Structure formats: C-alpha cells, structure tokens
UniProtKB/Swiss-Prot annotation:
CDD domains: SHMT. SUPFAM superfamilies: PLP-dependent transferases. This is Serine hydroxymethyltransferase. Keywords: Amino-acid biosynthesis, Cytoplasm, One-carbon metabolism, Pyridoxal phosphate, Transferase. HAMAP family: SHMT (MF_00051). The modification N6-(pyridoxal phosphate)lysine is found at residue 227. Belongs to the SHMT family. The gene is glyA. One of its GO terms (cellular component) is cytosol. GO terms for molecular function: glycine hydroxymethyltransferase activity; pyridoxal phosphate binding. Pathway: One-carbon metabolism; tetrahydrofolate interconversion; Amino-acid biosynthesis; glycine biosynthesis; glycine from L-serine: step 1/1.
Amino acid sequence: MWEDLKSSDNEVYEILQKELKRQEYGLELIASENYASKSVMEAAGSIFTNKYAEGYPKRRYYGGCEYIDEVETLARDRAKELFNAKFANVQPHSGSQANMGAYLALMKPGDTLMGMSLSHGGHLTHGAPVNFSGMLFNVVSYGVDEETETINYDEVERIAKDAKPKVIVAGGSAYSRIIDFKRFREIADEVGAYLMVDMAHFAGLVAAGIHPNPVEYAHVVTSTTHKTLRGPRGGIILTNDSDIYKSINKIIFPGIQGGPLEHIIAAKAVAFKEAMSGEFKEYQKQVVRNSKALSNELASKNLRIVSGGTDTHLFLVDLSELNITGKALEKALGQCDITVNKNTVPKETLSPFVTSGIRIGTPAVTTRGMKEEEMKEIASMIAKVANNVLDEEGNIDKDLAQEIKKDVVSLCQRFPMYADLIE
C-alpha cells in the first residue's frame, strides 16, 4: 500500500510501520479513537489533496473545481440524509473548527456562552479558559449533580435564567449518559438562547438510530467525523435553519478557514455512505453493548464507574478509592499495550495533567469484532494492572507487564485489523 513512500522516504515509512504495529497489536480504548476503513483511508490519501477550492460548490474562487464540486455536494447530501438535516457544511477541518464556526455564526465576542464544565465531562471548546471559547466569550458553566453524577436539568435551567446566555451548548467529551435535548431546547427557548449540540462523541450512535437525534431540537449541531462515525479526522455542522446556515457558511469561509481539505471531504462522503449500512447500525449497537459489559465487569472488580454506568460508547472510572491517579494508570496500562487516557472526574481535586480518573471507550475494539466475552478479558487485564501500580510513574512489575502484553497480543491477533499491511 505504501511502496512509493517506502522507496522515497524510508524514514517516514519505518515510523508508519511502527505505528501500524502499535495499532494492530495493542488494545485501543481511547473513546475518541477508531479504525477507519481502507476505503476511507484511500479517499483521504487521494489526488483530491492536489486541488485548491476556496468557496463552495458552484461558487469557487479557483477554476477546475467541477469534480471537487461533485464530491463536496455528495458529502453534503449524504450528511443531510444520514442525520435528517436540511443543511450541512462539511468543510470544517476539525470539531473545534466546527464549534468555532457555529459560535461565531450565533453570537459575537463578549456574548455569554453556557457549556458543561470540562471537569464534569464537557470539552475544551465549551468554554475552558485556556481555549478560544473561554477567551472570546463570557463563559458560564453547568455540571453534574454531586450525588447522581448526571445532569440536573432544573439546575441547568436555574443557571440559564440567571446568566441569560446567547448560546447553550449540550454535549461533551466524557459524559456517559443520554442527554435530554428536548429539555435543553425548552430551557434555551425560555431564556431566548440558541441551543447548540456538540455530538462529536456520539454521532455514530445517532446515525445508527440508537441515540436521540439532536438535529430535531437544536438550532445547530456540530460533530467530528472520526470517533464513533469511523471516518477521517474532520468536522461538520448541521442545521435546519436557512438563515443560520448562511451565517455558518460565511464564518467557515472566508471567516476562519481558507481552502477546504477536499481529500478529507471525499473521505467524509465515503464514511457517511458506510454509516448508512445495516452493518454500521449493528456495529453501533455492539459498541454500546460492549461499553455496558466492560463497565459492569470493572464495577464487579471494585472499580468505581462514574454515574454508576453508561448509556453510550464511553464511561469514566474514578480511581480515588484505589489511591492511584489517572496519569499513573494510563502509564501502567500503556506498558501493557492498552491505551486509555487520564481524565478528570466530578469533584476532581487534581490537575488535568494528573487527574483522579481514566476514560474508556469501546468503538475501536468493537470495530475489530470484539464482543461481550472479550470485554470480560479486557476488564480482567485492566483490574489486574490497576491493583498493581507501584508508583506515580505508573510502574508495575515487569513480569506482570510481560504477561499482560502477551495476553493483549493474543487477543488482538484473534481480531486482526490491518495485519496484511505489516511488513
């Protein structure tokens, strides 16, 4: 697949092969990661990368865009069909760019943005001080209830009435429960705010019809195209409002982006078609079944699951009672070729670089074909490591690490992904 690269730049090729082996022989449990199909990767690596195409279909600033127009229109039409939306912009380079585009289409710098606190499951772009969203807008945050660790909608309503935000954001990067979009829209309407839903994490579940579709309720919906959607790295914006759509288009180009990445847009089109298949719907159902099975199995091994479980593809493990940090367990699991990420939890007392928890997701292992029985194996490995972390650097007994690595490789070999590409 990469013969020309191998002959022209062996240094990059060797690094690529090392990453390929890491992905093939390791357990990927980062909730925001997945394995794109070869079709998606072929489109992303295609000759579409050669073409500049500032503007939109039929309204370009460069000549020679007739076939670029075809592929971008196809991507837009498929996105609209997939999510039952009237309008779609497929040009955002990322989820963060999509969020910036949506914000600037709905409000001005200095206006009030209301989003979920990062430490309670939100995202950097939902108002974190270090992010553009926190720098450009007056931010008011809501979180989860201390007891249930789920969203208290009455409290969200109280905060919204007090703050009178211009935009309310629903969605997050580490919230494991289904969100009541209807309730959020009622709150937004009550205070005269726009409702924006960031469905970057659960878009694949929405596409498969096993999660409520926020397009029915939100003024604007943003998403990434990787994660559960299993496409290339990129973003999209959806709306049913023609005026908002016009504003979004102006903000994306020429407002915050120049030439779109048409090779990635082509790959988005491929991913959207894949997401319309019956196989994809069954895949998403299995993602959730695996997530529930893995969280339940870990809970049975005395690891505390935030909110007591999950409705989606991800969940948080609170490590406070084990007296280890998320940073330490992330490193310890990494030594065993199991990849997770440290994550803040509700009532967090440590810095975001250390944290009291880890986030776990099942999209990637489910893409490999793993099911509930394999989740039991994975839970046993995680629990064994969690109970044997020696220090803050995440060191564990070398013999134990080798034993678990061997089990990881054995499991991965039963469910190959890109094995035929390894040299």
